[in-house]
A protein has these predicted regions:
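N-terminal mature ectodomain segment of secretory-pathway/periplasmic proteins
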Residues: 21-73, 77
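Hydrophobic residues embedded in beta-strands of well-ordered beta-sheets
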Residues: 56-57, 76, 85, 129, ...
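Acidic/charged, solvent-exposed loop-and-adjacent secondary-structure segments enriched in E/D, K/R, S/T
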Residues: 78-104
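N-terminal leader/targeting segments and the immediate start of mature chains
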Residues: 2-29, 35-40, 190-198
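Glycine-centered tight beta-turn/hairpin loop motif at sheet-sheet or coil-to-beta transitions
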Residues: 54, 64, 81-83, 154, ...
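A mature extracytoplasmic/lumenal domain signature
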Residues: 32-34, 61-65, 73-75, 82, ...
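Well-ordered beta-strand positions in beta-sheet-rich domains
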Residues: 44-48, 68-70, 85-87, 146-148, ...
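Gly/Pro-enriched, hydrophobic low-complexity segments
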Residues: 111-198
C-alpha cells in the first residue's frame, strides 16, 4: 500500500503502470552502469531496448561492444560481433524467465501479473515518483533483493537493481531522456542524480 502522501497525490502502482504501458512496437535508449573491483570507474554500456511485437524483447548494445539479445517466448538468443549466435531455453534460467515475464507485464501495464511475482510499493508524486519491486519467489529472492523504478509522469527514467548478495554492486540503467542526457564527459556521480530525477 502506498504511503498517505503518495495516495493524496493520486500516485499508486496502478497509476504508474497505466502510464508506463507501451504497445508494441516500441524502443528506448539506455545507459547501463556496471561496477567491478577490477575497474577504476563503473563500465558504461550504451544501447537500446526494443519490443518489435508483444512476445519479443530485444536488447541491443552499441558500445563498448556490439551485442544483441533477443528474448521471444521461452527462448533467448545472444549474438555478439565476431562470435556466432547462441540460443538457450529460459527454463534453464528460471530467474531470467521470471524477470522477462515481469518486464513484459511492466510494458503492458499489467499490474495483476506483475504482482504475482513482486510486492509493489510507491512513493512520490505524479511528477516525481518511485516504485519498489520486491520479489515474492524464494528462488528469485536468492538472486535479487529489489528493483526500484524512478520516473516523471509517464516516463520511466531509471531502473536500479539490487542483488541479494550485499557484496555485489547495485546496477543502474538510465532510460529515455535520462539516458539521452548522458555523454562521455558526464561524471559518474551525476548518473545517480539523473537516475533519481535530477
Amino acid at each position: 500500500m502506498a504511503p498517505a502522501g503518495a495516495r493524496d497525490a493520486g500516485i499508486d502502482s496502478g497509476w504508474i503502470l497505466s502510464k508506463l504501458a507501451r504497445p508494441a512496437p516500441m524502443k528506448t535508449n539506455f545507459v547501463e552502469t556496471r561496477s567491478s573491483k577490477l575497474l577504476k570507474s563503473p563500465l558504461r554500456i550504451y544501447g537500446e531496448y526494443g519490443r518489435p511485437d508483444n512476445d519479443t524483447l530485444v536488447r541491443t548494445v552499441r558500445a563498448p561492444y556490439v551485442e544483441t539479445t533477443t528474448i521471444r517466448g521461452t527462448q533467448a538468443t545472444i549474438a555478439r560481433a565476431g562470435h556466432g549466435a547462441r540460443t538457450f531455453s529460459l527454463t534453464r534460467v528460471p530467474e531470467l524467465a521470471s524477470m522477462q515475464a515481469s518486464f513484459g507485464a511492466l510494458l503492458r501495464g499489467d499490474q495483476a501479473q506483475l504482482q504475482q511475482g513482486f510486492a509493489l510499493a510507491t512513493t512520490g508524486t505524479r511528477e516525481h515518483w518511485r516504485m519498489g519491486m520486491t520479489p515474492k519467489s524464494a528462488t528469485l529472492a536468492r538472486q535479487l533483493k529489489a528493483i526500484t523504478l524512478y520516473g516523471r509522469g509517464a516516463e520511466l527514467r531509471c531502473i536500479e537493481t539490487q542483488p541479494a548478495d550485499a557484496r555485489q554492486p547495485l546496477q543502474r540503467t538510465l532510460l529515455a531522456s535520462a539516458a539521452m542526457a548522458v555523454s562521455a564527459s558526464t561524471p559518474d556521480a551525476a548518473l545517480e542524480t539523473l537516475c533519481h530525477g535530477g
